[in-house]
Amino acid sequence: MAGLDREKALDNALAQIDKQFGKGSVMRLGDDTRPPVQAIPTGSIALDVALGIGGLPRGRIIEIYGPESSGKTTVALHAVANAQAAGGIAAFIDAEHALDPEYAGKLGVDTDGLLVSQPDTGEQALEIADMLVRSGALDIIVIDSVAALVPRAEIEGEMGDSHVGLQARLMSQALRKMTAALANSGTTAIFINQLREKIGVMFGSPETTTGGKALKFYASVRLDVRRIETLKDGTEAVGNRTRVKVVKNKVAPPFRTAEFDIVYGGGISREGSLIDMGVEHGIIRKSGAWYTYDGDQLGQGKENARSFLRDNPDLANEIEKKIKEKLGILPSLESDAVAPVPVDL
């Protein structure tokens, strides 16, 4: 077939596809007018930097996993709070029936505006999540947790019955349905997951996550959250030092790590992250126990510097802006700043 004939045949095929499936169903990559990946801040600038784009990507699936009480739900709730602060709508599928509204409120979540569902079965949870995403109105949805998404057959069966692979099949089907809807609506879906140990593993890590392998494939970002140290005020434990490893990242280089403080009852210490990152990148100067910024003293000791920044939010915002500018992290866009390219589902 001659070159002109091939071009004409291709144009006819593209016109037919656009007519049948809608404009934009097929396009040349150079003609793609989609904006750069937008992000929802996590509440920790260290984690935002590790993610490479300033937060959790919009329109993607995120998996947050780790041991018990490591800070998984706290990270997710901070993302919810930041999405709401930008004018977005958030939903929380509480499959564990363990959401604490008071704690969520302390992290900045607008509990009056948060959509919450406590489903009876895994099928119900994922169907509700899918319907909310397809509405196109959500900015972020959290499913807590994958391990608690119990298939209906298991709930209705006897205690000793075997239900091999039911949850994995349920997750695989749900993620196949949701992926395109998430991209179309710009909704970020966070799946919180638990760790299990594989029996008989001689080499490598025996740890694995629940719900089969589908979530590992469909997730654009996977975060491994670990508690590495207990923060103490004298002899009293006041929080945890947390390390997050970005074990998978489809929107930026993976395998970066971030460390930050989680204060009991207060969540991620934003000011603590600013101090750590500011010192690391030469924006805040540390001399002995004193912290200074632009010639002004922030305080003696990290706790005093943290309190000073908490009392002076404009200064904290200025430091955050300088850190992001130095590291080339663009400011996160608000949910309605750029509309996603419509895709027929």
Swiss-Prot record:
Q: Give the InterPro entries listed for this entry.
A: AAA+_ATPase (IPR003593), DNA_recomb/repair_RecA (IPR013765), DNA_recomb/repair_RecA_CS (IPR020584), P-loop_NTPase (IPR027417), RecA-like_C (IPR049261), RecA-like_N (IPR049428), RecA_ATP-bd (IPR020588), RecA_C_sf (IPR023400)
List keywords of the entry alphabetically: ATP-binding, Cytoplasm, DNA damage, DNA recombination, DNA repair, DNA-binding, Nucleotide-binding, SOS response
Q: Name one GO molecular function term.
A: single-stranded DNA binding
Keyword match DNA-binding: yes
List localization entries. Answer: Cytoplasm
Give the GO terms filed under biological process for this record. DNA recombination; DNA repair; SOS response
According to UniProt, the name of this protein is: Protein RecA
Species of provenance = Frankia casuarinae (strain DSM 45818 / CECT 9043 / HFP020203 / CcI3)
CDD domains, sorted = RecA
